């Protein structure tokens, strides 16, 4: 199973959100509101980082 993360670039923030992609979007949105940008991603077995999407703070 894939483990999804919400990350904020240029910080140490890397939140594990488990195995359900749907659970990641609310956390991603909240972190984007606080830090300006956040991204939902996962890591392949070879270590490659795969981005599923992101939010920007445009409010």
Language model: regions and residue ranges:
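Local beta-strand/beta-hairpin segments that build beta-sheet-rich folds
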Residues: 13-17, 21, 50-52
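Intrinsic-disorder/low-complexity regions
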Residues: 9-11, 22, 29, 45, ...
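Short aromatic-glycine-(Arg/Gly/Cys) micro-motifs in beta-strand/loop hairpins
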Residues: 1-13
């Amino acid at each position: 199973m894939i483990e999804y993360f919400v990350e904020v670039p240029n910080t140490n923030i890397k939140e594990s959100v488990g195995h359900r992609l749907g659970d990641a979007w609310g956390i991603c949105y909240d972190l984007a509101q606080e830090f300006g940008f956040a991204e939902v991603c996962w890591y392949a077995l070879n270590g490659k980082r795969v981005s599923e999407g992101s939010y920007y703070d445009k409010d």
